[in-house]
């Protein structure tokens, strides 16, 4: 019988993940007439193109006031930092799990989390 550590290793690394990432994809601006379908009330997550492997949240502030948010798929990771130009600030966060761009918190990848758990179990036994 396989040990729990070996079973987790096989589960994480040998079973392929879903081939397509799903992210929230929408835009909301404070002064727009559009309904709030991206800030507090999110639409359903939708499939990204195959080369898009990150979900991104892009928040914009002006004079420290929240003015817009954009959620989208990306082929490049964002560093989770904010850049400031004058009174404007732009903060971009990325993650690698389906529908993970629902907030500004960065969610660790599934492989990373399971790897840490598997290592802990192997070292513990």
Curated annotation (Swiss-Prot):
Extra facts: The scoloptoxin-05 family has remarkable similarities with the three-finger toxin family commonly found in snakes.
GO cellular component: extracellular region
Any GO molecular function: toxin activity
Post-translational modification: Contains 4 disulfide bonds.
Entry keywords, A to Z: Disulfide bond, Secreted, Signal, Toxin
PANTHER family linked to this entry: ATILLA, ISOFORM B-RELATED-RELATED (PTHR33562)
Annotated family: Belongs to the scoloptoxin-05 family.
Superkingdom classification of source: Eukaryota
Protein name: U-scoloptoxin(05)-Er1a
Source species: Ethmostigmus rubripes
Localization in the cell: Secreted
InterPro entries: Sleep_regulator
Signal peptide limits: 1-20
Tissue: Expressed by the venom gland.
């Amino acid at each position: 019988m396989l040990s729990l550590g070996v079973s987790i290793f096989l589960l994480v690394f040998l079973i392929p993940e879903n081939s397509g990432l799903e992210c929230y994809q929408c835009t909301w601006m404070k002064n727009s007439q559009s309904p709030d379908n991206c800030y507090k009330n999110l639409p359903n997550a939708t499939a990204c193109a195959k080369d898009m492997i990150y979900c991104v949240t892009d928040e914009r502030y002006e004079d420290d006031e929240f003015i817009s948010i954009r959620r989208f798929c990306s082929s490049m990771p964002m560093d989770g930092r904010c850049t400031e130009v004058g009174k404007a600030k732009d903060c971009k966060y990325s993650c690698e799990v389906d529908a993970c761009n629902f907030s500004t918190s960065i969610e660790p990848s599934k492989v990373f989390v399971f790897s840490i758990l598997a290592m802990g179990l192997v070292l513990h036994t």
